[in-house]
Amino acid sequence: MSYWKKIKKKYMGDRAFYRHYLLLAVPMILQNAITNLVSFLDNIMVGQLGTEQMSGVAIVNQLIFVYNLAIFGAVSAASIFGAQYFGNGDHRGHMHSFRFKLYATLLVSGLTMLLLLTKGSDLISLYLTDTVGNGATDVALQYGKQYLVIMLVGLVPFAVNQAYATNIKETGQTLVPMLASFVAVGTNAVLDYLLIFGVGPFPELGVTGAALATVIARYVEAVIVVFWAHRNREKNRYLEGAYRGFGIPVSELKTILIKGLPLMFNEVLWAAGMTTVTQCYSVRGLDVVAGLNIATTITNLFNIVYIQLGACISIVVGQYLGAGELEKAKDADNKMIVFSVFCCVIMAAIMFLVGGFFPDIYNTTAEIKDLATKFIAVSALIMPFCSFSHASYFTLRSGGKTMVTFLFDSVFTWVVVVPVAFLLAHGTGLGIVSVYFLVQATELIKVVIGYCMVRSNVWVVKMV
């Protein structure tokens, strides 16, 4: 067999393989594409109100981001077993993992509400550095507080929705969560326009209207997903007896906690690390906060493909591992990683070429638009490397190597990325764009680590 044929056999699948992969991934990609598109429109509408409003909302969204990742970690702790339970035909085990998700997400929501109600103002202030002396940071703080109080009302429906939606996806049914998301983001977009600007009989509420629109949309999405799941019990066998009791067998709970707690802590610590990096950037002034907000919103539109392709790796590989088909798991993983990176290179190239047009949509200063354009270009250059490390992370997670993923993700962030950001932002005279590039470039170290870990096959484990 020629060298090219060996490479093709190892890293490229046939039509049936990609059809199966894309049937799972495309609904998730579309769901997140619509969500991020509406987030982009929401960001633009808030941006029309002014730099202070946009910055206040952006900072609060950084805090909510940590909560979102905590919820993701809570459901992921059980999902590493859920996919394998389903692949093994163990519906009762799948039900216990669902219960764990409900308990964990509601606990995280309660703790988050308590923290942000008592310390929200202090946390927002950490991101506000007045380098000009015009009082803009005080105005941004007030807008941030207005936005935060209302956003807290949407935490519980988000938590419940994630518990249900992730279990539904583990069964391979990605269409319903996608449709629910479409309805929710449509609701969000319409209400954003009506409530932010006061169209027709609706009051002009500004940032308060943006928060209300988001909260209402979250309730809509949760109701649709929960209603469908209970109306279609035959497709969601894990719901059989889910509410007849509240217990989880000690042995299963212990297993989930041992494997899952590192994953939960990983998501929280990684998200906290990323917000800390943003805080380091923010010491360079409110313009940097605004520019980063624009760039991050645009980047989120383009990184959807590699993020969702990576997430699908844990589902497909997890099902193979649960069924004991270890060689198929390794083969599928190789092909999915290559496909994910290939798709990301295309998206990154498009983002690099057209990303600079987006900042002009915002109602802000030329300086902020210029910063945003440069941040977008840097993000596009680094994105393919992020794709590989992201796929590596989900590969390791599919085999239950949560302690390894903990070291790979959050420990790396706090030991490498955060110190680099802090030292460059506080201790050098480098421009903020140079600082941003050097911090983002630390992803190359992570790529090397991820490659070695995946190649070692430590993740090829049947856990159920």
Region locations from a protein language model:
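Short alpha-helical transmembrane segments in multi-pass integral membrane proteins
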Residues: M1-A25, G82-G154, F202-G260, V317-I382, ...
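Generic alpha-helical transmembrane segments of integral inner-membrane proteins
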Residues: I29, A33, L37, L41, ...
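Short runs within selected transmembrane alpha-helices of multi-pass transporters and secretion channels
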Residues: V75, S79, I150-K169, P177-N188, ...
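N-terminal transmembrane alpha-helices
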Residues: M12-I44, Q48-L49, F65-F81, S109-M113, ...
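Small-residue hotspots at the loop-to-helix junctions and early N-terminal turns
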Residues: T51-Q62, G144, L148, A211, ...
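Small-residue-rich hydrophobic transmembrane alpha-helices
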Residues: M54-L114, F158-P177, G291-G355, C386-F408
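Helix-terminus/linker motif at the lipid-water interface of multi-pass membrane proteins
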Residues: A33, L37-S55, I124-D138, L194-L205, ...
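Transmembrane helical elements of multi-pass membrane transporters/channels
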Residues: L23-D42, I150, A184, A217-E221, ...
